[in-house]
Swiss-Prot record:
Residues 1-22 form the signal peptide. Neurotoxin active on both insects and mammals. It comes from the Eukaryota. Its main location: secreted. Pfam families: Toxin_20. This is U4-theraphotoxin-Hhn1a. It comes from Cyriopagopus hainanus.
Length: 85
């Protein structure tokens, strides 16, 4: 009985991991398709812009020099915005 339960739980865990990996691969392949609108990437860009601006504004309130948030992945913070390097 214990072995059956362990086997069922193991299979369920493998199925969940496999499904998650398959979903990630599908999402990646959709982003890599040529001719697909970059709406997903535009949303990421807008999010970076917002995060950078908000971070800088919060630091200005303390009467200190604004230390801009470090933007990652080929981006840098300039004039309160994340810009592509």
């Amino acid at each position: 009985m214990k072995m059956t339960l362990i086997a069922i739980l193991t299979c369920a865990a493998v199925l969940v991991l496999h499904t998650t990996a398959a979903e990630e691969l599908e999402a990646e392949s959709q982003l890599m398709e040529i001719g697909m609108p970059d709406t997903e990437l535009e949303a990421v860009d807008e999010e970076r812009l917002f995060e950078c601006s908000v971070s800088c504004e919060i630091e200005k309130e303390g009467n200190k020099d604004c230390k801009k948030k470090k933007c990652k992945g080929g981006w840098k913070c300039k004039f309160n915005m994340c810009v592509k390097v």
